[in-house]
């Protein structure tokens, strides 16, 4: 079975980012990148049932 190389590359990148995040952060709900005067924040809103 052949796989699309683009899909495989995207999957590897996503797994790498997720692994890096799990190793360096205590939570996956908030992720912030700062570069000088710029900041990018990704927040996940979730509620418990």
Curated annotation (Swiss-Prot):
Pfam families documented for this protein: HOK_GEF
Residue ranges crossing the lipid bilayer per the database entry: 4-24
Induction remarks: Induced by GTPase Obg expression, which requires alarmone (p)ppGpp.
Topology with respect to the bilayer: Single-pass membrane protein
Signal peptide limits: none
Any single biological process term in GO: dormancy process
Subcellular location: Cell inner membrane
PROSITE patterns the record matches: HOK_GEF
Primary location: membrane
InterPro entries: Hok/gef_toxin (IPR000021), Hok/gef_toxin_CS (IPR018084)
GO cellular component terms, A-Z: plasma membrane
Record key words, sorted: Cell inner membrane, Cell membrane, Membrane, Toxin-antitoxin system, Transmembrane, Transmembrane helix
Phenotype reported upon loss of the gene: Partial loss of Obg-controlled persistence.
Family per similarity comment: Belongs to the Hok/Gef family.
Role: Toxic component of a type I toxin-antitoxin (TA) system. When overexpressed kills cells within minutes; causes collapse of the transmembrane potential and arrest of respiration. Expression leads to membrane depolarization; when protein levels are high enough depolarization probably leads to lowered metabolic activity which in turn induces some cells to enter the persistent state in which they transiently survive antibiotic exposure. Its toxic effect is probably neutralized by antisense antitoxin RNA SokB, which is encoded in trans on the opposite DNA strand.
Name of this chain's protein: Toxic protein HokB
Organism name: Escherichia coli (strain K12)
Gene responsible for this protein: hokB
